[in-house]
């Protein structure tokens, strides 16, 4: 059972989602509908995008806690650009560029300057948040044009253009990691950095690329946030980094690197969003969301650690049991002296 859970984290997350769906369906029979599914998917888009970026970083055995601030900074960037008269495409591209530069800077700190990822991104978390507040003067950005809001307006099968783009990104990144040598380089880098270097993997480039793509995904999440609510508060992105990490760990991405899939992280993000919908259904205050996210993250980390220890213990027991069985068999085998009385008598005479 432990091996099944350890080796099928995506299936376990999917089972949890289906179980939660079933429980909510019992509470509210109107919950089972296409509208409910599309609503949850729309709500999960920001977390899904952040989970995609966090997966790339965590696979390389790093972590980025500045993505919430990058999300807020890029949301402010697109909002200010639009209000300054720039077009929608130019504003979005500018925000994506800002996110990529922010992620690239994180990668430089970790890869070239050898600063631990958690320390480097804690510093840039405050740096990017402060820059966001400097740009806005601590004020909200309102009056965003309708063009931006149209990105989150349902068009086909009740899914918005951003929703279709998100699904395309999921499929593309899943294929990249699972079917290309470049994608497998992320796993090799996180599993054994020195070994990957000896095999010719450009580990520094892989890690910088992971952080840069994480910044791009955070920027895209900021654009989605602005398009969904139509304004940009001065606290945009607060706490999203913890939810992104929780979604990844919940979906089977190891904090030790080299393990997990994009699909698992997406399922984790979907499950966390579904939990938020439960809070709405139960009419609990919104501030419970952060508490639940932290509780889920802590619980999953404890469970993951205990599960990994249990699996490793079982593997050791099986290995030692095989050696013990071989030793017992060798002890029971008759020796040459046991089968040859003459040899036994010579041995006794020698003694």
UniProtKB/Swiss-Prot annotation:
It is a multi-pass membrane protein. One of its GO terms (cellular component) is plasma membrane. Its main location: membrane. GO terms for molecular function: transmembrane transporter activity. InterPro entries: ABC_transp_permease. The keyword Zinc-finger does not apply. The chain crosses the membrane at residues 14-34, 39-59, 70-90, 93-113, 115-135, 155-175, 213-233, 252-272, 284-304. Keywords: Cell inner membrane, Cell membrane, Membrane, Transmembrane, Transmembrane helix, Transport. Pfam families: BPD_transp_2 (PF02653). It is found in: Cell inner membrane. Belongs to the binding-protein-dependent transport system permease family. AraH/RbsC subfamily. Part of the ABC transporter complex LsrABCD involved in autoinducer 2 (AI-2) import. Probably responsible for the translocation of the substrate across the membrane. The complex is composed of two ATP-binding proteins (LsrA), two transmembrane proteins (LsrC and LsrD) and a solute-binding protein (LsrB). This is Autoinducer 2 import system permease protein LsrC. The gene is lsrC.
């Amino acid at each position: 059972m432990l091996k099944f859970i350890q080796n099928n984290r995506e299936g376990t997350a999917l089972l949890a989602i289906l179980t939660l769906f079933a429980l909510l369906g019992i509470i509210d029979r109107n919950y089972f509908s296409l509208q409910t599914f599309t609503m949850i998917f729309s709500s999960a888009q920001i977390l899904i995008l952040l989970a995609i970026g966090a997966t790339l970083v965590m696979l390389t055995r790093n972590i980025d806690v500045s993505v919430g601030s990058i999300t807020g900074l890029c949301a402010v960037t697109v909002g200010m650009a639009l209000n300054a008269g720039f077009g929608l495409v130019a504003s979005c591209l500018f925000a994506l560029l800002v996110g990529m530069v922010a992620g690239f800077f994180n990668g430089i700190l970790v890869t070239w300057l050898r600063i631990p990822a958690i320390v480097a991104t804690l510093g840039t978390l405050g740096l990017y948040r402060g820059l966001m507040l400097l740009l806005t003067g601590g004020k909200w950005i309102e009056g965003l044009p309708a063009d931006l809001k149209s990105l989150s307006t349902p068009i086909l099968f009740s899914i918005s253009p951003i929703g279709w783009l998100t699904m395309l990104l999921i499929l593309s990144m899943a294929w990249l990691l699972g079917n290309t040598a470049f994608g497998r380089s992320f796993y090799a880098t996180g599993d054994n950095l020195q070994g990957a270097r000896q095999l010719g993997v450009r580990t520094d480039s892989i890690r910088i690329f992971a952080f840069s793509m994480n910044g791009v995904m955070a920027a895209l999440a900021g654009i989605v946030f602005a398009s969904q609510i139509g304004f940009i508060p001065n606290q945009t992105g607060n706490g999203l980094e913890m939810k992104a990490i929780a979604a990844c760990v919940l979906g089977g991405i190891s904090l030790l690197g080299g393990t997990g899939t994009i699909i698992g992280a997406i399922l984790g993000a979907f499950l966390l969003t579904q939990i938020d919908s439960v809070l709405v259904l139960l009419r609990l205050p919104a501030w419970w969301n952060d508490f639940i996210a932290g509780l889920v993250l802590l619980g999953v980390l404890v469970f993951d650690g205990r599960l990994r220890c249990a699996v490793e213990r079982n593997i050791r027991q099986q290995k030692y049991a095989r050696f013990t069985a071989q030793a017992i068999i060798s002890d029971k085998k008759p020796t040459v002296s046991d089968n040859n009385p003459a040899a036994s008598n010579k041995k006794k005479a020698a003694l």
